[in-house]
């Protein structure tokens, strides 16, 4: 096993903190690069959204790219984002009151309301009762579990589930299975539409300076989605899947770790790895950098 990627938080030339990051790259079911534990068990959290939206995309090919992107989003409740959520609700003949996201600060302003609006539309398309769609016992959630399992090529019974922050089930998989699921996304039915939507509107996933958006802008042809507690999954157009997990859940370590890991695979990352620390005046007071030699491709791993 290669060492985890170590990301240093540097202020005034002093290393103030260090984040350990597990990373794995998978192609055609085989691990091609790793750092740390490639099989650490992780919850997909919001990184599952590009997979969870597949049943809806397959059933409603008339959805536009903005609607698909918002259904994959962990948005910031910007006006343009909420307008698209409302459009999805209208398609579902539903209202904000039907969202089961919880009032934070209102149901439609919840960061996962796009996904939930997509779930309501999926219920309408499938003929499911909308009420209770967030419950693990609901037929929609059973279908989504099957969808995630099929993407990762695992037995659904092997997937541990828990309740996500927005109230719906979330799925635990080994990190390499997360990467495998994303590696297969371009070839799955509806997957190309999801990737095209993410690439067309990366700022809808969260915001214009979020890691997802910066990644899509800087890494040609790739799509990605981050999840809570420091998880990040991405795929190339030719079927390379990558998944990273920060041990302590600090998402700020993702960009430098991801850039360093991808560069070992020969992937150009532009300014992705340039992560700074700013004070309350917006002044740069530090930076995040990976420690040299803390990440190596599998073929060169120190064992």
Language model: regions and residue ranges:
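Structured C-terminal helix/loop/strand segments within mature extracytoplasmic catalytic/sensor domains
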Residues: 186-303
